[in-house]
Amino acid sequence: MRKPDFTALRVQIVGAKGHTGAMLRTVLTAAGVGHVVQIEDSRRALSLLSSEHFDAVFVEETQLDSMNFARSARKRAALRNPLIPIFAVYSGPRRRDVEKARDLGVTNVICRPVSPKTISDKLLAALLKPRPFIAAPDFFGPDRRARARVWRAGDRRKHIPRKSTIVVDS
């Protein structure tokens, strides 16, 4: 199989400082990503996402400030691409970390150490086969269900949920 061509991609790294940021930038470059912008401040990163086109965002999830980056990005009306893939990069995430990232609108969680192949595979999946986006009163982001499951039991909900919309990028 041919190596994917990511030379035209513009990717943003948010919140990664020093050695961590340099390593992530190196791995993205080794995966073939053509243009990588590294920003430490999440407010500045959101501003840049509103004014420039980016194909994906990698968020270092070690800072409290960057923990809510995905939520802010998904809620921001001025964002040029509200369906942009957002990847959270963790070193040893726990289940609750993954669930929180998912609930904040993160597309996928990546564990460090990360390889160019992992980055390439995750980018390909997010760009070529994106999950549908859900627009609900309390959530906007990729469908949180990793895979579709057939439910054969009865409805156990105690309350009828408020109306949600599935957004499909065409």
Residue ranges and their predicted role:
Residues 114-127, 135:
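C-terminal output helix
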Residues 68, 92-108:
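Alpha4 helix (beta4-alpha4-beta5 surface) of REC/receiver domains from two-component response regulators
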Residues 33-41, 48:
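Short hydrophobic/Thr-rich beta-strand motif most characteristic of the beta2 strand and flanking loop
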Residues 12, 57, 62, 80-95:
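A short, hydrophobic beta-strand element within the central beta-sheet of small alpha/beta folds
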Residues 128-170:
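CheY-like receiver
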Residues 7-19, 24-28, 38, 57-58:
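Conserved acidic segment of CheY-like receiver
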Residues 51, 55-82:
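Conserved phosphotransfer microenvironments
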